[in-house]
């Protein structure tokens, strides 16, 4: 998360003597769970150039993997899930995919958190999410909706690391 951004939100709410509830959400192996088909559809939905989508698809359509186990490499197979580790494009692709999940989760969600006239439900950096709410029930509802939306895209919230 951007340095001190959550702290700034807290400070503003404390200054105005308003309740602010947080939940820090962690996904299990988030970058490994990006569904390629959903990513391409999301890019199209967000009006990203079809030529650019095709170039990225070509990079990923040729991607193969193999499992190294007991000092030997297994059979090679095509990958249809995950973004490439170490690739400069991976964070951007992940953010596009996560935006789809978050949009589905917070669609029609009423949030009591407002700063500078803007309604805020979450702060994000890569796969780190700070869910925000003005009441405990509202926060629980946000987490439930996020869990449903992420499960639909085969991304799992880590109960152990979410607090």
Locate the predicted segments by residue.
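Nucleotidyl polymerases of mobile genetic elements and RNA viruses
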Residues: 1-163
